[in-house]
A protein has these predicted regions:
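Nucleotide-activated chemistry modules centered on ATP-dependent adenylation/adenylyltransferase
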Residues: 1-241
């Protein structure tokens, strides 16, 4: 197994998984890959500093390394044949479903490019596109919106986080990131630290193309103080429109 230390998401999400296991009466399999710290490391510079290469809106490899790859590896080990995977996109997120469906191959399956061996001299990896999942979207099929989901879970013993994904997700708007820096200070500080290191060690690379996270953290907003209820999924970078 792997020692669990924590995540860069709202800690409520971890409790949600425990609550769901009790509610449905079934085990939920936890999968894990590299830590975020390891995913962004790119060796050492001449001065001994660790080079940090950050994902950003133009290259979001964090999703592949920390979500898709661990799921694929678990599937490969335990199932290893194409299966239907039910994706939780809601009725207003048809655009996201279309993006996924546009990637289907001629067999209407998604493929994952994975290492399947080594070259004859053992110096290079051999890669193959492996068919592994057929996505299904039951919430879209049944025309389920967020209010339907909230009503369903109302008064049930499962608590959900207000916002999903990493607190410093680069898809989020500036106001939302500022709110996260105040609500989850220690987690957001990790993003600030990594960006400062990346600026020094990897071609001035940053998380967000609009504003450095250190500036977002120190930004003194004038006027309204935001609460969780003031933000939508569009602010989180996942608008279904």
């Amino acid at each position: 197994g792997t020692e669990f230390i924590g995540t860069l998401e709202d800690d409520v999400i971890i409790k949600t998984i425990f609550d769901l296991e009790q509610f449905i009466g079934q085990e939920i399999h936890w999968v894990t890959g590299k830590t975020f710290d390891d995913v962004i490391k790119r060796g050492k510079r001449a001065n001994g500093d660790t080079a940090i290469y950050l994902p950003n809106p133009t290259m979001r490899f964090c999703t592949t390394e920390m979500k898709l790859k661990p799921i694929f590896k678990w599937w490969q080990k335990t199932i290893n044949k194409p299966v239907e995977m039910r994706i939780g996109f809601r009725a207003n997120e048809m655009r996201r479903a279309k993006t996924m469906n546009d990637k289907l191959n001629s067999n209407n399956l998604l493929e994952y490019k994975s290492i399947v061996g080594k070259s004859k001299n053992g110096k290079r990896n051999k890669w193959k596109n492996i068919e592994w999942q057929k996505p299904a979207f039951p919430l879209i099929t049944d025309v389920i919106y967020k209010d339907n989901i909230i009503n369903y879970w109302n008064n049930k013993p499962v608590k959900f986080a207000v916002h999903n994904n990493c607190v410093g997700c680069f898809h989020r708007e500036i106001h939302m990131l500022k709110h996260m820096s105040e609500k989850h200070t220690s987690k957001f500080d990790w993003f600030v630290k990594q960006e400062e290191q990346s600026r020094k060690t990897y071609n001035d690379r940053s998380w967000n193309l609009k504003m450095d996270y250190s500036k977002i953290k120190s930004w003194n907003r004038q006027g309204q103080i935001f609460t969780d209820d003031d933000f939508t999924e569009c602010d989180s970078g996942y608008c279904g429109l």
